[in-house]
Design a protein with these regions (language model features):
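Extracytoplasmic cell-surface/polysaccharide-interacting catalytic and binding patches
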Residues: 1-183
Length: 183
């Protein structure tokens, strides 16, 4: 956070820069979880169960439900295929991906590095805080780049912001996010 500071400009004129804090550090909507901002393995998340057995942080349930309803009102069939998962579940997924890559001939180091671009290291996934949902088209339920061409994904990419959601891992941003594109 920047507070009032006197800054000398190149022309030696004094200028005052004043900024305000954008949010409280505890603002759950702005919680960033990634490789630099890990969560504890024992984090307590208050989730609500969805009809299909998935779960999300209860604080974003209404917005998610409204987004899904509005998408369906357009004649589309969105499906939540992945949402909240515990640290333990994340660890299992990550270790399974490493195992799969080792069986493909990757070295231990390369397998771990490659796995981390596809499956988040435990403690670094927004799924572990219940704020991430993977939504697919009922007619194409694969979590692949081709998902971006489905009517559901096109609608979501155009409208998700209206409900407080974003495309978390955009195309061509792997160097910034550390994660491959996930439409």
């Amino acid at each position: 956070m920047i507070t009032k500071n006197n800054v000398r400009a190149a022309n030696k004129n004094e200028k005052t820069i004043e900024t305000t804090k954008l949010s409280k550090k505890s603002d759950w909507k702005l919680l960033l979880v990634n490789y630099q901002n890990k969560i504890n393995s024992d984090a307590k998340i208050d989730v609500v169960q969805l009809k299909n057995g998935q779960a999300i942080d209860k604080r974003c349930y209404e917005e998610l439900q409204q987004m899904m309803d509005d998408c369906r009102d357009e004649g589309l069939d969105p499906i939540i295929c992945s949402s909240y998962r515990s640290y333990r579940k994340q660890k299992i997924l990550y270790e399974q991906k490493i195992y799969d890559l080792l069986n493909e001939g990757y070295s231990q180091t390369k397998a771990k590095n490659e796995a981390a671009t596809v499956v988040a290291i435990p403690g670094t996934s927004e799924h572990e805080i219940g704020l991430a949902v993977d939504i697919v088209d009922d007619n194409y339920q694969m979590l692949e780049n081709e998902q971006e061409n489905t009517p559901v994904q096109k609608w979501l990419m155009k409208n998700c912001w209206k409900y407080g959601f974003i495309l978390r891992y955009p195309e061509n941003k792997k160097k910034i996010t550390g994660v491959i594109y996930e439409p």
